[in-house]
Structure formats: structure tokens, C-alpha cells
Amino acid sequence: MTVRRALALAALALAVSPALAAQERPTIVVGSPDFRPLPIAVAAFQGEGDAGAAATQTAEVVRADLVLSGLFDVLDPRGFLADPSEGFAAPSIRFARWADVGADGLAKARVRRGPAGLEGELHLYEVRAGREVLVKLLRVDGADARSLAHRMADEIVRYYTREPGIFATRIAAIRRGRGTWELVTQDMDGGNQQVLLSERSILMSPAWRPDGREILVTSYRSGRPELWAYRFSDRAFRPLGRHRNAFGGVYSPDGSRIAFTVSEGNVTDLWVMSADGAGARKLTSDPAIDVSPTWSPDGRRIAFVSDRSGTPQIYVMGADGSGARRLTFQGNYNQTPQWSPRGDLIAFTARDERKVFDVFVVSPDSGAINRITQDQGRTNEEPSWAPNGRLMIFRTDRNGGIQLVVSDARGDRQTPVTSGKTDLAAPAWGPLAP
């Protein structure tokens, strides 16, 4: 990019933000009684030089991301034709034509190859107001059009909802191979899958550190379950703490503590320790089985599974182990609780009398339960929340093979994000991208 071009883009960004963009900004309020998806057109992106194919892929992924969010009614690009004479400056945009096809929002972009990777210049317009409201220059390393698209979609969501987007986040999961267990990550929509670890011993229960720098897993490398941490910066895989028969570790929201389970003889209790593995102490001392801790977003409470009532049920207690109370009273086999980052819901898996597994959510305060899946295969399990608490991902066999599905918090919109059969298990949604 030339110096003149960079200065022009900076001036344009100042011109459209923040004052102009703040005027009568159309805000999407999810969950409001009058919510409706916002109609938006994502025009064909312009590829500069040899970036034509990358521009096409970027636009396609942006459209798919916005559809997956459930916040937008993304108009079919076959319903409108590109106008070669239409530029990017607001005076050149034929807003009346875009209004005629039903668009309230319009996204356009230039994509080019920069010195270190792809660059995208995103432009967003409010069609009814006839103005440009956002311009953003985004860069990604290498030729990763998908990552560029996810960042663009995040910017669009941020403008309309005033909340961070979650498309640039990653999902961790365990994949079983022939005699191997792999720790893998992928984009939240199933793309860009990468293998981080391949072990000949069992791997289970991945859990992200809140800053995204490490993933905690349960490893059987020593022949017994132990907590190990994978570090992205140097790909180190190291044991954490001194407990054998420790499993299911999860970081506290501030990353300073880890709650986990220890099985000693016939006793299975919850423990907590500092993030470096020091200072471990018991949280529960009960003859029952206590497993699967999950933190409230403020770090003050922990939900977990216990069979102290005779069957596995969800309980909530203080983060110091005090005041445990039963939360679920429906069903006789409830497991894998996951506390929403918004704090209002806990997702979990329940098994019914037919041995069918489904996903539910429960209010941690009132105990009110809502069903997310029903009659959608025999297995819907292991829910994990997106960092915005509006979406979750879980494992399902509804189409004849194991898949990962993204759902909203009500279960109204459920979208497979893996194609065909997959052996992925224990999906864990990672934190917001830096």
C-alpha cells in the first residue's frame, strides 16, 4: 500500500467514526421481543492484482459467518448484480438500488496481497441512511482468506451489536485415530483444522486458558489420568500439579486457578490449585462422586456433577466449596455442565430412560430448564459455550455420523460445522481472538 493510499484510508476512517457512526446507529438487540435478523447484502469483493480468488473466498466466508450468527438475513448474491462503476466512496454507491433488493446494510471490500499476507479493506454502509459508517483495514499472515473473512465478519457484528464477534475464535477437540488420540483445533465454523498433539495414550477434556495461550487436557501418558498443559508459543506439553488420577481440569475466568477432579480409591472429589499447579486443596469431601467442575463467569461459584442424591445431578457451590445446593431435579442422569460466559445459563447433557442423550440449559438461580435438542439422533452431548454466551457447540450423531453443531442458546437455530463423519469429541470453544 502506498503512503498516499494509507493516509487516505486513515482520513476516511476518521471521517466515519466515531461520531457519524454513533448517530442513530441501528443496534441489533438479541432476545428482544421485536428482534428480527437485519437484511444485509455482502457484495462481491474486489480482488486487486492476483487476489481475485482470495477475494471471492473471503466474501463467501463472510456471508456464511453472518448466516451462522443468526443476527442477519444475508441476501442471496444472485439477487443483485455487481455494478463495475460503483466504487467505495459513499457518493458513488447507488443506495436506492440496494434498498430495492431489500438491504438495510451493505458490506463491500478490497482484498490484496501485502508484504506479509492478505490485506482486506472493509467498508460498511447503512443503506436507508445513505452513508458509509465503517472502514477498516485488516491484515492476516500468509494467504489465509478464511481468517481474513472471520475478522471482517467480527467487525460487522461489532458494529451492529456493540459486542465482540466470535468468528475468529477456535474450537479445541479430541480426535480418536487408529491407536492414537489427537488434540486438534479448528475455526469455529469447522475450517482450518490443525493437529497440535498426537499421542498413543488417551487424551480427554480439553479446556482453554482464558488468554488462549494454553490448553489444559487430561493425559494418560503415565498410565493414569493426569493434568497436562499444551502451550502454543513453543508447543511444549508438560504435566501440571503432582496429582495422579486427576482429570477434567478447567481454568477460572481470570486464569489464576484450576478446578479439577481427583479419584482416590472409592472417593472422587473436586480440588482447586493455582494455575502453576501449586497449592492444591480439596473443595468437596463427600462419599459420593463429584466431577465436572465449571466456573461461573465471576469466578465466585462452581457448578459440578454429583450423585450424592442417588443419581448424577447438577449442583452449585461457592468457589471455596461452601454452600453446595442441588440445581437439577428433572431426569436421573445429568452431566457435563458448562456455565455460560453471560452467567445466566448452564448448559448440560441429560440421558433419558431410552438412553438418548440431549442438550439442555438451566438457570443457575431459578432452576428453570429449557430443552435445546429433541428427536435429533440418539446422542447430543458435551455442550461448550462461545465466549459471547449466545452460541454453543456440541457433539451429535443426528445425521448418521458424529458431527459438531453450533446452536443458539434457545435451540432455534442449529447448524452443522463439520461435514460428513468425524471422530471429534469434547469440543471446547476458545476465547476471543486478541
Curated annotation (Swiss-Prot):
Region called Disordered, residue ranges: 411-434
GO cellular component annotations of the record: periplasmic space
Signal sequence, start to end: 1-21
Keywords: Cell cycle, Cell division, Periplasm, Signal
InterPro entries referenced in this protein's UniProt entry, alphabetically: 6-blade_b-propeller_TolB-like (IPR011042), PD40 (IPR011659), Tol-Pal_TolB (IPR014167), TolB_N (IPR007195)
GO biological process, alphabetically ordered: cell division; protein import
Location(s), subcellular: Periplasm
UniProt family annotation: Belongs to the TolB family.
Entry function: Part of the Tol-Pal system, which plays a role in outer membrane invagination during cell division and is important for maintaining outer membrane integrity.
Assembly, per entry: The Tol-Pal system is composed of five core proteins: the inner membrane proteins TolA, TolQ and TolR, the periplasmic protein TolB and the outer membrane protein Pal. They form a network linking the inner and outer membranes and the peptidoglycan layer.
Protein name: Tol-Pal system protein TolB
Originating organism: Anaeromyxobacter dehalogenans (strain 2CP-1 / ATCC BAA-258)
Gene: tolB
